[in-house]
Amino acid sequence: MSYLFNNYKRDNIEFVDANQNELIDKDNNVYLDFSSGIGVTNLGFNMEIYQAVYNQLNLIWHSPNLYLSSIQEEVAQKLIGQRDYLAFFCNSGTEANEAAIKLARKATGKSEIIAFKKSFHGRTYGAMSATGQKKITDQFGPVVPGFKFAIFNDFNSFKSLTSNNTAAVIIEIIQGESGVLPADSLFMKQLNEYCKQKDILIIVDEVQTGIGRTGKLYAHEHYQLSPDIITLAKGLGNGLPIGAMLGKKNLGHAFGYGSHGTTFGGNRLSLAAANQTLSIINDADLLNDVQSKGQFLIENLRKSLVNKRNVIEVRGVGLMVGIEVTNDPSQVVREAKRMGLIILTAGKNVIRLLPPLTITKKQLEKGIEILTEII
């Protein structure tokens, strides 16, 4: 008997330990991790991050946001660098998107926000209302009003929905949950130019794509795009719960005293993990290596799977990769697990690969070999 709600479809396996890019179950079986806990443990199970959190455990764990926090300032500086932003820390991606929605509406005095079909921004009410998937929203009664949904990568569809009451657009650089669908470069350029012309704020949801996943600190750096607001989570704490919302400094007036807040957001344990994570991630060599390994993974998957009739396409950016197939991908996930490889699905028919950024070429080759045999 379980004491838990049955809202997850749990596999009959429990991981109890880990070693860098490998997971270990309670029977001591070892698995190669191509999931990173759904894009969370981007640096694997990293001893430098462990040590940073351990050191903080020996100091203060939590203090409310009524007092100064030098570690919040330090992590914010690493996230922002020379960019013109301010930071707000929270506990998750959905909370970061809630903050972004509130900031956009308050700063502009407008209520409409354009999102995209097949998007995913979270499961709390505002973020859920911005999600363009009926299976996520339809069971819970009326959603938050003011959201419109354009076709992803279709500029005319987006433009047709704008009005004098449009506060912002919220967009994922790569639609992860719907099948690893990257944004088109021309579309992003057109969207950026139009929004700047019409004073429409651009909110970029980097919850899954950020913190080095695509070979850049932020995935929008691959495009001609200048976001007004950026949301982050997942890989930021490398396994500890943390989210962040970055907003342009000229929006700072809208988030003054009492406008928004959180009890646990910016707590020192999660910030200790984020601080060390960013110290490692903000390394040009590491990010270049992610791009190189991502190219290696995509090219070799394409070569290995070229004659597989049930493979439609291999796509992705950096180490965020999707294999679109004609059959149910959950069957591949089960067989991969049996052979010692942990992978994910996305959308209806996509195998999603999110290996740690620290994965080795040898481990990538092993994963490709297993996938080729199964598919």
From Swiss-Prot:
Binding site for pyridoxal 5'-phosphate: 93-94, 120, 205-208, 263
Localization per record: Cytoplasm
GO-annotated biological processes: L-arginine biosynthetic process
Disulphide bridges: none
Required cofactor names: pyridoxal 5'-phosphate
Pathway(s) it belongs to: Amino-acid biosynthesis; L-arginine biosynthesis; N(2)-acetyl-L-ornithine from L-glutamate: step 4/4
Gene Ontology molecular function terms on file: identical protein binding; N2-acetyl-L-ornithine:2-oxoglutarate 5-aminotransferase activity; pyridoxal phosphate binding
Pfam families: Aminotran_3 (PF00202)
Residues that hold N(2)-acetyl-L-ornithine according to the record: 123, 262
Modified residues (N6-(pyridoxal phosphate)lysine): 234
GO annotation, cellular component aspect: cytoplasm
EC number per UniProt: 2.6.1.11
Broadest EC class assigned to this enzyme: transferase
Cofactor stoichiometry and binding remark: Binds 1 pyridoxal phosphate per subunit.
Catalytic reactions on record: N(2)-acetyl-L-ornithine + 2-oxoglutarate = N-acetyl-L-glutamate 5-semialdehyde + L-glutamate
Alphabetical keyword list: Amino-acid biosynthesis, Aminotransferase, Arginine biosynthesis, Cytoplasm, Pyridoxal phosphate, Transferase
Protein family (similarity comment): Belongs to the class-III pyridoxal-phosphate-dependent aminotransferase family. ArgD subfamily.
PANTHER family to which the protein is assigned, alphabetical: ACETYLORNITHINE AMINOTRANSFERASE, MITOCHONDRIAL (PTHR11986:SF79), AMINOTRANSFERASE CLASS III (PTHR11986)
NCBIfam families associated with the record: argD, PRK01278.1, PRK02936.1, PRK04260.1
Subunit relationships: Homodimer.
Note: May also have succinyldiaminopimelate aminotransferase activity, thus carrying out the corresponding step in lysine biosynthesis.
UniProt name for this protein: Acetylornithine aminotransferase
